[in-house]
């Protein structure tokens, strides 16, 4: 019996030895209304926003817009500003009130810059002011109503 420890395991030196061959892989994707818009990464949320950014946003003006799309399972969507301009990113943590936004809902919101470059904006303190007519709305607790 030898008192020397066994040599440490060596990592594989060739891709084929670990099953990573250069083969084209395609992934089926479901159509998404959010595909044309770029989602910030990492997603800025109410929890991760700094106190100073929250204060600046709260003191800012209130804007009006329409919900372009919102995916509850993904936790984000976009608002089309009433005065034109590029769509504004919306995170689930910034939606106030009892209803999940749907396409066509009229909303009011304030804006906050998205770090680290602060070049883009996101909607915060989002409030649904008018539910889109003829659509079903869900509450955060799961109840469905027709508007």
Swiss-Prot record:
Can you provide one Gene Ontology molecular function annotated for this UniProt record?
mRNA 3'-UTR binding
Where is the protein localized?
A: Cytoplasm; Cytoplasm, P-body; Cytoplasmic granule
- Ranges where the CSD domain occurs: 62-129
Region (Disordered) residue spans: 1-52
Cite the record's Pro residues compositional bias ranges.
1-12
Q: Which residues carry this modification: Phosphoserine?
A: 30, 32, 41, 52, 58, 146-147
Spell out which residues are annotated as carrying Phosphothreonine.
45
Subunit relationships = Homodimer. Interacts with STYX.
Which UniProt key words apply to this protein? Acetylation, Cytoplasm, Phosphoprotein, RNA-binding
Under Gene3D superfamilies, the record lists: Nucleic acid-binding proteins
Record PTM N-acetylserine, positions in chain: 2
CC annotations in GO: cytoplasm; cytoplasmic exosome (RNase complex); cytosol; P granule; P-body
- Cysteines joined through disulfide linkages: none
The membrane-spanning stretches of this chain are none
Q: Briefly, what is this protein's role?
A: Binds mRNA and regulates the stability of target mRNA. Binds single-stranded DNA (in vitro).
Q: What name does the UniProt record give this protein?
A: Calcium-regulated heat-stable protein 1
Q: Which domain of life is it from?
A: Eukaryota
Q: How is it modified after translation?
A: Dephosphorylated by calcineurin in a Ca(2+) dependent manner. Can be phosphorylated by DYRK2 (in vitro).
Under the heading Pfam families, the entry gives:
CSD (PF00313)
């Amino acid at each position: 019996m030898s008192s020397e420890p066994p040599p440490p395991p060596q990592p594989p030196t060739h891709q084929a030895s670990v099953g990573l061959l250069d083969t084209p892989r395609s992934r089926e994707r479901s159509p998404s209304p959010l595909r044309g818009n770029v989602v910030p990464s990492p997603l800025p949320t109410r929890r991760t926003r700094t106190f100073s950014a929250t204060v600046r946003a709260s003191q800012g003006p209130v804007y009006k817009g329409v919900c372009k799309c919102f995916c509850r399972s993904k936790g984000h969507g976009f608002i089309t500003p009433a005065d034109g301009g590029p769509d504004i990113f919306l995170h689930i943590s910034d939606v106030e009130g009892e209803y999940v936004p749907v396409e066509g809902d009229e909303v009011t919101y304030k804006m906050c810059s998205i770090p680290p470059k602060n070049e883009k904006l996101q909607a915060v303190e989002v409030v649904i002011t008018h539910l889109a007519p003829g659509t079903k709305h869900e509450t955060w607790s799961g109840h469905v109503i027709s508007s």
